[in-house]
Amino acid sequence: MMGRQAVDQSQLFYLFNLEEHIPTDHLLRRINPIVTRVLADLREKLAPFYSDIGRPSIDPELMIRMLIVGYCYGIRFERRLCEEVKLHLGYRWFCRLELEDKVPDHSTFSVNRHGRFRDSDIFRQVFEAVVRACMDAGLVKGEGFAVDASVMEADASRYHGKAPGEIDWSAPERQTRAVAEFLTALDGEDADADRKPPKVISPVDPCSAWTAKANKRVQFGYGLNYLIDIKYAVIVDVEATPARTYDEVAATKTMIQRTQERLGLKPDWLAADTAYGTGKFLHWVIGAGITPHIPVWDMSKREEGILSRADFTFDRERNLYICPQGKFLRTTGTVHDGRTIIYRASTRDCGPCPLKPKCTPNMTFRKIPRDLHEDARDATRALMGTPEFAKSRNERKKVEMRFAHLKTHNGFERMRLRGFSGARDEFHLAAIVQNLKTLANHIWRPLLNTPTACVA
């Protein structure tokens, strides 16, 4: 016989225990003890940024827990997050809210984000506390690191980009936090020979970069930079940059130095893709005592049938190249663009040479550029055929898996906040959640695989 549900929701009193309705293997239950430990000294860290008088504020731990919930489940808009926490029993339990407790208003997050959260750099501190928890659990080996960057689309229309000289930054509609942050950074920026001024800039988020990386459509974006420990793919550092290769390589230096200073971690080797294989960066890596497992960025290959630089022999003692015919290519020692030395052959040698059609068909003499840090490039090339290099190249994919998980499972493909500060906030929260999941899975997997396991 077909049953019928009795619809009567007029009961006034219920015997209800929120704890009993959260499954033992639920994600929030698994990460809860870790978060409790990580946030144990949160109030102490934020105390200098609160007044000693006035009404009590919303508990900062409640706001941090709500943000963790949001980034765990792809709820990055605070207005919707407040609605979901209000309705979801599991979210209420994790945020330590009873059924009758009021959920904070969404505007509370904006006020704290632009104020005490950024002033105290609390997201960075929470992130590092989670990394230390991973280290205590044995998830960080500290021998091999991998680095990579992924483009996150900025909250800026790609159709409204303008040349920098066309924008009036003093206009009333331009008086925003993102623009103020950009202008402040512009005033304090040092001139750099390697950096070219942007051709297109966003009026609403000028800190983002005009990019078409990864074969995507042209857009404004930020670079999400991850430095991971290879063993369990724990994110040991994270940095926000414009979506430009130059800035991403520079961010890697910052992350490695900061990881060593704050966490006491220094890798024996570093894995990365070809974008990081410039002579300048390889020189820095080797100078830091780290073995670079990075393919060398080599643009010396010529058309088929044309002699390339590899066909010439470099004489280190005499500082010159020797061509296949035994002629010399010398240099004046002038450094071009801050990184290249040009070696030139003599017109008298190249003119009657029988190999000229295969060597320099369009010029009267042959010239060869040599990177200022070619020694570092040569040392790295010598590593590229080793078994260790092949193994690290395969393990390097773990950092790409981090980006894939973030975009597919967490729905993180477009920025919600603007400016570098907004990007840093979002990237730190994303890394916090990913590390929490890794740590929770490592701790709970043995318990979940034990039939008699009982978790309180």
Q: What is the meaning of each model-derived region?
A:
Residues 1-15, 166:
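Short, flexible loop/hinge motifs at secondary-structure junctions
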Residues 71:
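Short, aromatic/basic-rich helix-turn unit that serves as a nucleic-acid recognition element
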Residues 92-96:
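Short arginine-rich
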Residues 4-5, 74-87, 97-456:
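Anion-binding and metal-coordination hotspots
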Residues 24-68, 372, 376:
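Basic, short loop/linker segments at the boundary and entry of helix-turn-helix/winged-helix-like folds
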